[in-house]
Amino acid sequence: FDLANYYSMHPVLLDEHFRSLPPIINYSNKEFYGGRIKVMRRNDNSKKVLETVVVPDGKVDFDATRNLPEIEALVKRLHEIVIEDERKNPDNPVSIGIISPFRAQVEQLKISVSKVLSEHMMEKHQIEIGTAHTFQGDERDIILISWAYANNSFPQSLIFLQKPNLFNVAITRARYQMINFISKDPRELPEGILRSYLGFVEEYENRFALS
């Protein structure tokens, strides 16, 4: 069905949006809100704010809800972000959120992150790890999303992670930067909002590379 029309019949938002840089909110504005949001922040063209990391060796485990290679790639990137921020910005640290649609992936992410970052560093950077439900009404400077979807994922997993309301929450929590992790070429995904969204991200990345 037409998501834009659905949400236009169920008004739940203020028209002005102050949280996210335009590239982060633009997809949601078009797909879910019919372009009714007025984005109040200006573009920051000096830094890539949308990104997709494809994990080529990623695969889900027996219950199709944990993807350890994807977790490893995300935690490595998280560690790099924190180290760079501590070097450049020690007195005003960025806040970081980590989202996955699947509870088992979230729990494994918590374990893996705790092995890399101290409790002090997690508190300093306000690191929260959870599903989209965890982040409803919340936001962070940087969001990393583990979609935990791979070539061996069950089709039902894709149906679950594409629930419109939760998908919309997940992709709109970041203020400055949004990094997606997935273990399947987005262009090989079935038609749906995940493929559409990651295609939007790819188009943004291509434009940014030429700017």
Over which residues does each language-model region extend?
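Conserved helicase motor
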Residues: 102-103, 129-135
